[in-house]
Amino acid sequence: MERRKTLEYVTNQKQVERQILELVKTYNVLYKKQIYAFFAVDGKEKFVGKALHALLKERLIYMNEITKTVSQHEEAYQFREKGTLKAFWVLLSLMEQKKIERHFLAEKEEYPVRIVFVGDAEIYDILYISEAEIQLVNQLFSRQNPDGCGHIVIVEKPEEIPQIEIPNVIGFCTVQEEEGGIDYYRREERKRRNTKAKRTIGCRAENSRTCRSYACGSP
């Protein structure tokens, strides 16, 4: 019995190592907190510490103790992308609420999309739009044919939401990049031009990423 438990532990440990390596290769740079949160969804966070240590020892990853980030190599941090880090927090939030079958980093050509994921055989994406990019993004989407993909849009401030004019948005949110706190919002039906964003989740807790609600219903 004891041997079986040991073998099971080692198997889980190796599996977590492989998954961490895959995550880092996919998203380039992640906060260590994000990696722990990713495995906490399946109750495997207890394997993360030793897995990171093993990967560091083999020089398969690099960990910056100042920024608390994990990447493939030391130079990678300077190429970190704020929108992707925020989008990964949103992905983690959704993973706590529903089954995410697949997820991957969007191509540069898919700007402003950062992460694409599949849930219940439906495709969704997570966008990051800074205040300076709103007009450009509106123009880009005005030239595209709607693809039916549901969009979750990250903004810097909720006051920016009424300015965003893209189809198939199922929810808006603001995200704290390093801590992962998330506030979700939805936009009321456009009966007037001065549509306001309606806050749907009161997430001011220390870890608001774990709130069990979604702005416009689960995607």
Residue locations for each model-derived region?
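Hydrophobic transmembrane signal anchors and adjacent membrane-proximal interface regions, especially
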Residues: 4-5, 22, 35-37, 102, ...
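Short, structured coil/loop segments at alpha-helix boundaries
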Residues: 10-17, 44, 48, 84, ...
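Catalytic cores of nucleic-acid endonucleases
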Residues: 128-182
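Nuclease-adjacent, charged terminal/linker segments that flank catalytic cores
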Residues: 1-79
